Design a protein with these regions (language model features):
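Non-heme di-metal
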Residues: 1-134
Length: 134
C-alpha cells in the first residue's frame, strides 16, 4: 500500500516529531539533574531519552520505506530540510514574532536561518563530493 498522503503517514510524522522532541527535552533535563547533583535522576532521564530515540527511529524508518536511506539520499534529504528552514520556516517565524513585538525572538529566528543556510550548503557540497567520488 502507498503510505504517502494518508492519515497514517501524518500520524507517523507526528509520532516521529513527538519522540524526537521528548528525547531532546529529556537530555536537557538530564543535564540539569547532573548540574544539581541528582546523578540517579540524570541517568533515568538519559535512559528514557535513549528509548525515545529508538521509538523515533522506528517511525522514521517506516516513513523512509522501512530503512534509513543511503548516505547520498540522507545528504539530499538533510539539504532539503535545511533549505525549507532557512527560506520558509524561520523567515515566517521571524516575521510573526516581530509583528507580535518579540523582536529578540525574531532576531534569533533570523540568526538561526543563516546557520541553516550554511548547513544546506555544507550538505550539498558533501553530496557533490560523493557524486564526484572525492
Amino acid at each position: 500500500m502507498e503510505l504517502k498522503g494518508t492519515k497514517t503517514e501524518k500520524n507517523l510524522w507526528e509520532a516521529f516529531a513527538g519522540e524526537s522532541q521528548a528525547r531532546n527535552k529529556y537530555t536537557y533535563f538530564a543535564s540539569m539533574a547532573k548540574k544539581e547533583g541528582y546523578e540517579q535522576l540524570a541517568a533515568i532521564f538519559e535512559e528514557t531519552a535513549g528509548n525515545e530515540k529508538e521509538h523515533a527511529k522506528i517511525w522514521f524508518k517506516l516513513l523512509c520505506g522501512g530503512a534509513i536511506p543511503d548516505t547520498l539520499t540522507c545528504l539530499d534529504m538533510a539539504a532539503g530540510g535545511e533549505h525549507d528552514e532557512w527560506t520558509e520556516m524561520y523567515p515566517r517565524m521571524a516575521k510573526e514574532a516581530k509583528e507580535e513585538g518579540f523582536n529578540q525572538i525574531a532576531a534569533l529566528f533570523t540568526m538561526v536561518a543563516q546557520i541553516e543556510k550554511e548547513h544546506e550548503e555544507r550538505y550539498l557540497k558533501l553530496a557533490q563530493n560523493i557524486e564526484d567520488g572525492t
